[in-house]
Amino acid sequence: MADLDWLIARPVAHRGLHDQKSVIENTPSAFAAAIAARYGIECDLQISADGEAMVYHDDALGRLTEGCSRLDATTAAELKRAAFKATGDSMITLGELCDLVAGRTTLLIEMKSRFAGDRRLGSRVAAVLSGYHGPAAVMSFDSAQIADLRAIAPGLPRGMVMEKQGWDAFAAAPRRAMMTFAQALSARSQFIAYAVRDLPALLPTIARGVFRLPLLGWTVRSTDDRRKAARYADQMIFEGFRP
């Protein structure tokens, strides 16, 4: 098991350190603010039509930017020209994010997925991070993406993003069955990011306690969330305040 103490050494700013006003999520300004405050950075990636890893959460434009097209139907050059509604920032690529961070803090990168078998994003992430020398880890809700990443970039730290929703069948499973599942999970993943609202839960408890997988709680937004993360996880992914 890789030593991932660096991954849980400091609180991680969810989509950068943003305020939903002058500093918008997943923008260079939010990432610069997180670096200045000495937090880790969590960000989201979507694939563009031409196979570039773009730093953006939604699978389509519109919520934060002008336009309404799907990211996977729009080229990287077009996406970089899409104006944010409330800031002068532009959308950036993973490579540009790596240049901005330059190893000054932890990068926790979530690969978004439509669960449709498109594996281009993992390949692009592996290619970009192969030339990056700062601390970085990749995670996804899509277990197939993580399995692919293990195959093409076995040295790249990888983890699963999880929540109770969608796992209700496992919630009632006997402990032995949950132990078997957690063991299989640990074979693919080196850490888990679990919804703090669903903690404590049996699966992350076994993964953390038995298989020693680092556990991050997301997204911590309240005093109660923070208390739960401190008790049941190794670190928090936070938003809306400064820990």
What do the predicted segments below correspond to?
Residues 1-243:
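Phosphate-group recognition and catalysis centered on beta-loop-alpha active-site segments
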